[in-house]
Swiss-Prot record:
Keywords: ANK repeat, Early protein, Repeat
UniProt key word Nucleotide-binding: no
Chain positions of ANK repeats: 54-83, 253-283, 313-343
Domain of life, per lineage: Viruses
Transmembrane segments: none
SUPFAM superfamilies named in the record: Ankyrin repeat
Family annotation (InterPro entries): Ankyrin_rpt-contain_sf (IPR036770), MGF_505 (IPR004858)
Record-given protein name: Protein MGF 505-9R
Keyword Repeat in record: yes
Source species: African swine fever virus (isolate Tick/Malawi/Lil 20-1/1983)
Induction context: Expressed in the early phase of the viral replicative cycle.
Role, per record: Plays a role in virus cell tropism, and may be required for efficient virus replication in macrophages.
Family: Belongs to the asfivirus MGF 505 family.
């Protein structure tokens, strides 16, 4: 319950002059040594009609003087109890502290309001269960460096504590305290600052880390070079250009940055450096981009830096494209509005040589490659499996398949490749009924292309058809063989002609 006097004091906003000094004193509105007190709104008081202070500041002063009546008045005017405790600590008025501290309950709530390190420590001591570690941690939170400086020697003997405080200061981005700890205490893991700087993306903290590192080691130190390299890799991986530039001030290789930037498609970093590096490096980066399956924009940036001049390293590029099964760069070179670079066939040849059937089919669909081209390449490279699978997929009808394969033989120069396709044709006919015309045409085809063994086999198969027509075919084949000097074909044709003559009734 408020007394009548308290109610008057709490709600009195009128000028005090008409009341007279005696009434002001009786109302408890007179502050000894300062003058009359008048409430000014919710946050300020006027002292002796001239001096305006915040209620909290006035409360702190009154408590430091031990003036319990004025403290009570200012609390009545919504003054914060925490400032009363601070003032009481300044004047060492423990009776006031005892009276009001229980209403707050936790000294840690007061600490952020204190500027004086001595009062700060005194306030912390109000909680008798707190340790020095608690004091140091709050000192870091509240930027109370003098507390740490006071106990610096004691801290140096506790490596675990120093490391804990150092990392805490880094997380709170308290640069002054970080600097003091780094230069004055034995921090066993200084590098923790960099991990925190990366997480917070705090370049100031990152730079401070290098300042502390260089206080311990030189830029020529092997460990320092290793640290720089790790930082460059991580910063470029995350696309942090400012961090990359900061690290490069102290050493490291731009190549390290570029390879990571390509791998993770950080074009901002690439664009910053790419036009200042030698062509050989750009070529390696393009190969790395293929391996990393980089984006279209990354490839365009790299290619534009060498003006799309691919000749010096086409072989290496094709090898990388086939090895990693990533064809985007082939497509980009083909899509150029001017001066298209067509590597489709060159890449296809490598694929046919080294890749599986599904991979080749995927490539054929992507670049609209006709099956004849693939089959010819497969024949030259002796890939029987591809000839069979691709021809079967392209032409389900066997006669249609034979027709296309025969056309390929006509247009091929590679002898072994032609033979392979012809054997494949014969293999198809083994499971297909051929009428006389089809069988005779195929026999003549083998004669024209000097496929002796296949010619013999087809001659045997043709004996089921009309022998007169067969003899005419063999004479035609003999004429072809003599014209081209196909000795074995001629001998075979001649042999079968004689045989037909022997078995035919006169």
């Amino acid at each position: 319950m408020f007394s009548l006097q308290d109610l008057c004091r709490k709600n009195l906003f009128l000028p005090l002059e008409p009341l007279g000094k005696h009434v002001v004193q009786r109302l408890g509105l007179y502050w000894k040594g300062h003058g009359s007190l008048k409430q000014m709104g919710q946050c300020f008081v006027c002292i002796d009609q001239t001096w305006i202070l915040s209620i909290h500041k006035a409360l702190q002063i009154a408590a430091s003087e031990g003036n319990e009546d004025i403290v009570k008045l200012l609390i009545l005017w919504n003054g914060n109890l925490k400032y009363a405790i601070i003032g009481a600590l300044e004047g060492r008025h423990y009776d006031l502290i005892q009276k009001y501290y229980n209403q707050i309950g936790d000294c840690h709530e007061i600490l952020p309001l204190i500027q004086d390190p001595k009062i700060y420590e005194r306030c912390h001591e109000l909680n008798v269960t707190c340790t020095f570690q608690c004091l140091f941690q709050h000192a870091i939170k509240d930027n109370m460096l003098p507390i740490l400086q006071k106990y610096g020697q004691d801290l140096n003997g506790n490596r675990r504590m120093v490391q804990l405080l150092y990392e805490m200061a880094c997380r709170l981005q308290n640069y002054d305290i970080i600097k003091w700890i780094g230069f004055n205490l034995q921090v066993y893991n200084l590098e923790a600052i960099f991990s925190i700087a990366f997480v917070r993306k705090d370049l100031t903290l990152y730079s401070l880390g290098y300042m502390l590192l260089l206080n311990r080691m030189s830029t020529e130190d092997r460990n320092f070079i290793s640290i720089i390299t790790r930082h460059l890799e991580y910063a470029s991986k995350k696309g942090l250009l400012d961090f990359v530039l900061e690290s490069l001030k102290y050493g490291g290789q731009v190549d390290t940055v570029l390879f990571q930037a390509v791998k993770y498609n950080h074009r901002k970093i690439l664009a910053h450096f790419i036009h200042h590096v030698p062509r050989e490096i750009v070529e390696k980066l393009i190969l790395h981009a293929v391996e990393s399956r980089a984006s279209r924009k990354t490839f365009n940036l790299l290619l534009s830096s060498i003006n799309y001049c691919m000749n010096p390293f086409v072989k290496k590029l094709l090898h990388a494209v086939v090895k990693h099964k990533f064809m985007l760069i082939i497509k980009l070179l083909l899509e150029r509005p001017k001066k298209k670079i067509n590597l489709v066939n060159a890449a296809l040849f490598k694929l046919v040589k080294y890749s599986t059937y599904p991979e080749i089919v995927k490539y054929m669909k992507e670049f609209s490659v006709n099956p004849e081209m693939v089959i010819k390449m497969a024949a030259r490279l002796m890939r029987v499996d591809l000839i069979k699978k691709i021809s079967k997929d392209a032409w389900e009808n066997k006669l249609e398949r034979i027709k296309h394969l025969k056309q390929m033989v006509h247009t091929m120069n590679h002898r072994n490749g032609k033979n392979l396709i012809m054997y494949n044709i014969y293999d198809i006919t083994g499971y297909t009924y051929l009428n006389a015309k089809e069988a005779f045409n195929l026999t003549r085809f083998y004669a024209v292309h000097n496929a002796t063994c296949l010619f013999k086999e087809m001659c045997k198969n043709c004996f089921v058809h009309d022998l007169i027509q067969l003899r005419e075919l063999l004479e035609d084949c003999l004429h072809i063989a003599n014209r081209h000097a196909y000795i074995q074909i001629a001998e075979t044709a001649n042999e079968y002609i004689k045989y037909i003559d022997d078995i035919t009734p006169k």
